[in-house]
């Protein structure tokens, strides 16, 4: 897939090439032309990739001179059980559903691992359905456009709460004609403008707003309360986003919470819960409040408008409710008063959610009414029902330091109650409304700017290893700075003719004295623990323990005793129970400055290795892990066992390629089968040559097999070019321990007693 090799900002033009190839190509050409035109005055150069999402058996393998992703590559992202789907079912609806899920995964991966700058597609009703939910899964702010035949009338099912833009196609998307040319050209130009505009504005405004943003829910019957709350929050320095509690409003607010646009919530009007429980037309769903609680942001909750359920015109109210107390808000909206029994159900729903919270929550309850209609002389005034609601919540909620329940002798629309809401919120939120808060969609661009600042600090670092800004969209400046300093030191050593020496460590004492000996790099991985327990290194590839958990345990032992030398983590990239992006962040936070791919499937061969590759547990996962780590600014030093693997790792951005010659042969538990020392020279050279064809600046080290002593390392280094040193694991700690302890004990045993 061509896009995998490019880390520059990139847009995807997506459609079904089997039925709309000409239209997709025309759109892609105009997107590229507009991007090039707009980019003349921009520092960003944006690439275009065409993505085929066809579900027929007709294969398309290219589209003019564009980078192209065939449908089979998108389909490979669809996981079902333990395998993948190799072909689509004959039923069109099922095929579209599968491709939709595959595309969603494909875009999610692209957004996480590349600089995805935007997506644009075209289609009829089926194509729009296929594209829209996948597009909606991307963060708000990333341009997302569909030219569609159904871009009119009821479009909520396509757009949801996202910022997806639908362009009416006017005519059917069936060939290029005078009308479709105009529509596709304009849509392509508008999309290109969104992309460049976002990239440029993000350079200047990467922090979305200096103000802490608060989401507030409102209904017409709680407007006085919300207006007073909003006015007070603005005076306190906060920005407010008000959402009409219509079902869609609550979902929109929680989507913005997930995206990082909202940092606190005053959920004053929770009436959507009533519609959900009873069956109204403005209902939330079962996930209401989940995003707020998962993000652990300040939440103040009240019971606004929980005295009513919403329906359309009076004639649409279900027959079983026709005898209930109904208030006709207008010709299109009818409100039904809730009962004591229903209020108990609302309280149970809310309490069940909030009792699971692991962050601070405050529930504020007004005793004298929950809406403008719940007041003396108004249609829904019912002190018994209101009292039941508030008392039920007090009884069900776990009132403790984490969850506070406060009851006030006010009506919800009294200014005193509004002030009490804000006071409770201020107790939980930052003292100042001014904070640095990034949205999900702006983080990658902010990362590039931070990287730029670091790289400007090191102007002498002008090789490929240092200067490609777009390689580091997810890098923290401090992480990237460590990487650059380490690589610069290594480059300085190489320029002075000194070898780079890396070492594996399985214990704190090994690492401590490797550093004392002057080693340049230390790598921790599970086989080090097994080696120092008297077992062979291959134990680290067998199901004896959790390899990644062992590395985290070893960090506590090793990192405190190593003072200056870079310490890297050996990562089992094929681990099916860890999300690699999250695990790498965990390693970074612990204190590791880089990673290596170990345990590695490279040590397997034959049918077993082939089966691993065929079942999605192959070396490619290790390449992906290294690429992800590289984008985070971590130092990457992967093992490669052949030239092809070296090429893949170099293209992934690896800083140091370690040419692995197999299990070390020396010592009491070393291997007996390996290449000869002479053969290893040829193998190491081939790996070095392949690496340098991709990245001439990459560092190459030799390792393993017959290379188990300083003499053997010197033999290889003197007979190769472009190989800069040696990395030892068994040879650095197991063999010295075997030899030193054996010799020391023998010396003691040789003491004469005469």
Swiss-Prot record:
<dbReference type="Pfam" id="PF06792">
    <property type="entry name" value="UPF0261"/>
</dbReference>
<dbReference type="InterPro" id="IPR013785">
    <property type="entry name" value="Aldolase_TIM"/>
</dbReference>
<dbReference type="Pfam" id="PF09370">
    <property type="entry name" value="PEP_hydrolase"/>
</dbReference>
<dbReference type="GO" id="GO:0051607">
    <property type="term" value="P:defense response to virus"/>
</dbReference>
<feature type="binding site">
    <location>
        <position position="55"/>
    </location>
    <ligand>
        <name>ATP</name>
    </ligand>
</feature>
<feature type="binding site">
    <location>
        <begin position="18"/>
        <end position="20"/>
    </location>
    <ligand>
        <name>ATP</name>
    </ligand>
</feature>
<comment type="subunit">
    <text>Homodimer.</text>
</comment>
<dbReference type="GO" id="GO:0044830">
    <property type="term" value="P:modulation by host of viral RNA genome replication"/>
</dbReference>
<keyword id="KW-0945">Host-virus interaction</keyword>
<dbReference type="GO" id="GO:0005524">
    <property type="term" value="F:ATP binding"/>
</dbReference>
<feature type="binding site">
    <location>
        <position position="92"/>
    </location>
    <ligand>
        <name>ATP</name>
    </ligand>
</feature>
<comment type="subunit">
    <text>(Microbial infection) Binds, via an ATP bridge, to the tobamoviruses avirulent (Avr) replication proteins (large and small subunits, e.g. tobacco mild green mosaic virus (TMGMV) AC P18339 and pepper mild mottle virus (PMMoV) AC P89657) to inhibit their function after the translation of tobamoviruses RNA, but before the viral replication complex formation on the membrane surfaces; this interaction is not possible with resistance-breaking strains replication proteins.</text>
</comment>
<keyword id="KW-0067">ATP-binding</keyword>
<feature type="region of interest" description="N-terminal inhibitory domain NN">
    <location>
        <begin position="1"/>
        <end position="201"/>
    </location>
</feature>
<protein>
    <recommendedName>
        <fullName>ToMV susceptible protein tm-1(GCR26)</fullName>
    </recommendedName>
</protein>
<dbReference type="InterPro" id="IPR051353">
    <property type="entry name" value="Tobamovirus_resist_UPF0261"/>
</dbReference>
<keyword id="KW-0547">Nucleotide-binding</keyword>
<comment type="similarity">
    <text>Belongs to the UPF0261 family.</text>
</comment>
<dbReference type="GO" id="GO:0003824">
    <property type="term" value="F:catalytic activity"/>
</dbReference>
<feature type="binding site">
    <location>
        <begin position="124"/>
        <end position="127"/>
    </location>
    <ligand>
        <name>ATP</name>
    </ligand>
</feature>
<dbReference type="InterPro" id="IPR009215">
    <property type="entry name" value="TIM-br_IGPS-like"/>
</dbReference>
<feature type="region of interest" description="N-terminal inhibitory domain NC">
    <location>
        <begin position="211"/>
        <end position="431"/>
    </location>
</feature>
<dbReference type="InterPro" id="IPR015813">
    <property type="entry name" value="Pyrv/PenolPyrv_kinase-like_dom"/>
</dbReference>
<dbReference type="InterPro" id="IPR044122">
    <property type="entry name" value="UPF0261_N"/>
</dbReference>
<keyword id="KW-0611">Plant defense</keyword>
<comment type="function">
    <text>Inhibitor of viral RNA replication which confers resistance to some tobamoviruses including tobacco mild green mosaic virus (TMGMV) and pepper mild mottle virus (PMMoV), but not to tomato mosaic virus (ToMV strains L, ToMV0 and ToMV1-2) and tobacco mosaic virus (TMV). Prevents tobamoviruses RNA replication by affecting the association of tobamoviruses replication proteins (large and small subunits) with host membrane-associated proteins (e.g. TOM1, TOM2A and ARL8), thus inhibiting the replication complex formation on the membranes and avoiding viral negative-strand RNA synthesis.</text>
</comment>
<dbReference type="InterPro" id="IPR056778">
    <property type="entry name" value="UPF0261_C"/>
</dbReference>
<dbReference type="Pfam" id="PF23189">
    <property type="entry name" value="UPF0261_C"/>
</dbReference>
